[in-house]
From Swiss-Prot:
Cofactor: Zn(2+)
GO molecular function, one term: metallopeptidase activity
InterPro entries given in the database record: M18_aminopeptidase_1, Peptidase_M18, Peptidase_M18_dom2
Superkingdom field: Bacteria
EC number: 3.4.11.-
UniProt GO cellular component terms: cytoplasm
Protein name per its UniProtKB record: Probable M18 family aminopeptidase 1
Gene Ontology biological-process entries: proteolysis
Length: 458
């Protein structure tokens, strides 16, 4: 199935559309780097587009635009469709968490008169990639009186940045040079340099005390308050065009905020009432298995679908309607996939691997080895998606996650499929996935938006 590079056949007007769409995305991905930040952004934009908190609605009719917020870290947007909801919905589910470092509950320490922030890495990172790179600290802290304090340090013009200092090559021979990549630094040593000025004190750890004093002066945060916090450490810096032609985007967190952005824009841009109820669901915790009360395994999906159906059916509501609505639904697990990286092309089956700039990849299954932990979309659903994309002249390509037994991974697809929802993975291809600088194609981003919008309209 050889295809010509789609860029070649594009008009200048089409190229301008793609580049203009990407500029808005770059601003988004540069500013909103955590799941809380993306949720807040999405809610603000949705309200401007006419979406209303579902808690304020007692009845729902076709055309109503509503949202459900799950503890400020997951959010679902829905447009009630013309058809009976028990006949099925069209869902697109992406995740807004990305691999990162999280501060420990008691994080601040001092070693050799330098103050550090102790961390626990979150998700599948290559630990060595986080050494000697500028870092930003973001999150929330709840003070002892319950007051919520938000932190965002490292990306504003006059902000300091933070760093995990690496060992110099002159002294790394025994401690690092001959180790495997995942042993170059131990997880326990992913400690972030946050201060060096001591204060006058009779106590030890004068630099730590000085750092804590500065934090208290600016944020009212005391050392014990970190126990009730969610502090995330992410790469500092903004999204950049990659290459002389500027056709690629380099940024942190594109897994999976590129899909979150495309699916949000798609549902916001729906001009007519869809036939089926359209749902855009942004979830948390995918990178660690979709666990926790804000992950897809929490059954929040079932909760808000039940609430929608109750507000549609009222006295005629019953649980069977919920089960039918889920069973008859189709969903896109909107998550990125691994593009061929020519430097490491031996891990891919080139005939079944996506390329940057060839359109949105269709991934029938993920998992590892013998399709273990995969949902494996049925041929009927793949046929439906293929026809949908072709009918709307949307560029697409096939994708698998590397050669058989080379490795593997998973998405939220299996959790959606557990409800009986027919599910397929479909999201842009990425080079350097899970790194501080992931690379995507502007063409693929735009075609993801077109694909998601076409799916909602069906």
């Amino acid at each position: 199935m050889k295809k010509q590079n789609p860029w070649i056949s594009l008009s200048e007007e089409e190229k301008n559309q793609i580049f203009n769409f990407s500029e808005s995305y770059k601003k988004f991905i540069s500013k909103f780097k955590t799941e809380r930040e993306v949720t807040s952004y999405a809610l603000d934009k949705a309200k401007k587009r006419g979406f209303i908190d579902a808690e304020e609605k007692k009845n729902l009719i076709p055309g109503d635009k509503i949202f459900y917020t799950c503890r400020e870290k997951s959010v679902a947007f829905a447009i009630i469709g013309k058809n009976p909801i028990e006949n099925g919905m069209n869902l697109i589910v992406s995740h807004t968490d990305s691999p990162r470092l999280d501060a420990k509950p008691s994080p601040i320490s001092e070693e050799n008169e330098l103050a550090f922030l102790k961390t626990n890495y979150y998700g599948g990172i290559k630990k060595y990639q986080w050494l000697s790179t500028p870092l930003s600290i973001r999150g929330v802290v709840f003070l002892k009186n319950g007051e919520k304090v938000e932190i965002n340090i490292g990306d504003n013009e006059n902000d300091p940045v933070f760093v995990i200092p690496d060992i110099l090559p002159h002294l790394d021979k025994k401690i690092q040079r001959n180790k495997k990549s995942d042993e170059i630094i131990e997880g326990e040593n992913l400690k972030i340099l946050i201060g060096s000025l001591p204060i006058e004190s009779k106590e030890q750890d004068k630099v730590k005390l000085g750092t804590l004093q500065l934090i208290k002066e600016k944020y009212k945060i005391e050392e014990e308050d970190f126990v009730s916090s969610e502090i995330e450490i992410v790469p500092a810096g903004t999204a950049k065009d990659v290459g002389f032609d500027k056709a690629l985007i380099g940024a942190y967190g594109q897994d999976d905020k590129i899909c979150a952005y495309a699916s949000l824009e798609a549902i916001f841009d729906l001009e007519e009432i869809p036939s089926k109820t359209a749902i855009c669901f942004l979830v948390d915790k995918e990178e660690i298995g979709s666990t926790g009360s804000t992950g897809l395994d929490s059954r929040y999906l079932e909760y808000f679908v039940s609430d929608m159906i109750f507000k549609i059916k009222k006295s005629e509501y019953n649980n069977l309607q919920v089960q039918k609505a889920l069973w008859n639904s189709k969903s896109i697990s909107a998550d990125v996939c691994a593009a061929i990286n020519p430097i490491f092309n031996s891990v891919h089956d080139a005939q079944n691997a996506p390329k940057l700039g060839y359109g949105i990849p269709i991934m029938k299954y993920t998992g590892h080895g013998g399709k273990v932990m995969a949902s494996d979309a049925d041929a009927e659903l793949v046929s439906y998606i293929r026809q949908l994309l072709n009918k709307n002249n949307i560029a697409w390509q096939v994708a698998t996650l590397g050669k058989v037994e080379e490795g593997g991974g998973g998405t939220v697809a299996k959790f959606l499929a557990s409800y009986g929802i027919r599910t397929i993975d479909m999201g842009p291809a990425v080079i350097s996935m899970h790194s501080p600088m992931e690379i995507t194609s502007k063409f693929d981003l735009y075609n993801a938006y077109l694909a998601y919008k076409a799916f909602y309209k069906e």
